[in-house]
Structure formats: C-alpha cells, structure tokens
C-alpha cells in the first residue's frame, strides 16, 4: 500500500503568493499563512520523564532488555515474604 501524497490535499492556488493579494480576504489568508509558517517542522522531540518507572524502563526494559527485572521480582517477593512471616511470627508470640 503506497502512502497517499499530502500535496494533493493542498491546492496550488491556495498558497500562491500572487493569488494572496488578489482577493479582498488576502489579509485573513495572510494571517493563516503566517500561522502555518510558524508551526514547527519535522518530528516532535521525544518527551523525557524523570519518574522512577521511566528510568527503570529505559535501563532494564527498553533497548537494553535483560533478565534483571526477573531477579528484582524474585528479590522483592523474598523480602516481602520474609517481612510478613516475621510480622505474623511476632504477632503469634504476643497473643500466646
């Protein structure tokens, strides 16, 4: 499927400089041309986020994907399970 050319959307007489001054609404058309000429050209810059999740994604899951997130998950489960076991063990001794 070939991309549709964008030039066919804009008729050549609309942006013609000689045609701009010929119509009585040329001031309005001049403002429109001025507005569109000030718009940025090219692709939009990539947004950078400074959150922990964006940093983690860039470091471990982006272009440099590795197995480190699996190790982090295993470590987090071990820490959580140890903390919960310790809490319930102390709670059991307080009740008896």
Curated annotation (Swiss-Prot):
Cysteine-cysteine disulfides: none
UniProt GO cellular component terms: matrix side of mitochondrial inner membrane; mitochondrion; proton-transporting ATP synthase complex
Compartments reported by the entry: Mitochondrion; Mitochondrion inner membrane
One Pfam family it belongs to: F1F0-ATPsyn_F
InterPro entries tied to this protein: ATP_synth_F0_fsu_mt_fun
Source species, domain of life: Eukaryota
GO biological process entries: proton motive force-driven ATP synthesis; proton motive force-driven mitochondrial ATP synthesis; proton transmembrane transport
Keyword Transferase among record annotations: no
Keyword entries, A-Z: ATP synthesis, CF(0), Hydrogen ion transport, Ion transport, Membrane, Mitochondrion, Mitochondrion inner membrane, Transit peptide, Transport
General function of this protein: Mitochondrial membrane ATP synthase (F(1)F(0) ATP synthase or Complex V) produces ATP from ADP in the presence of a proton gradient across the membrane which is generated by electron transport complexes of the respiratory chain. F-type ATPases consist of two structural domains, F(1) - containing the extramembraneous catalytic core and F(0) - containing the membrane proton channel, linked together by a central stalk and a peripheral stalk. During catalysis, ATP synthesis in the catalytic domain of F(1) is coupled via a rotary mechanism of the central stalk subunits to proton translocation.
Family to which the UniProt record says this protein belongs: Belongs to the ATPase F chain family.
PANTHER family from the UniProt entry: ATP SYNTHASE SUBUNIT F, MITOCHONDRIAL
Entry protein name: ATP synthase subunit f, mitochondrial
Organism: Schizosaccharomyces pombe (strain 972 / ATCC 24843)
């Amino acid at each position: 499927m070939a991309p549709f050319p964008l030039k066919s959307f804009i008729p050549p007489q609309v942006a013609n400089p000689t045609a701009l001054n010929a119509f009585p609404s040329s001031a309005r058309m001049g403002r429109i041309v001025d507005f569109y000429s000030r718009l940025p050209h090219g692709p939009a810059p990539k947004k950078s986020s400074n959150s922990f999740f964006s940093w983690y994604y860039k470091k471990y899951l982006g272009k440099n994907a590795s197995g480190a997130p699996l190790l982090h998950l295993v470590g987090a489960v071990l820490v959580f399970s140890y903390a919960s076991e310790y809490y319930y063990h102390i709670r059991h001794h307080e009740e008896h």
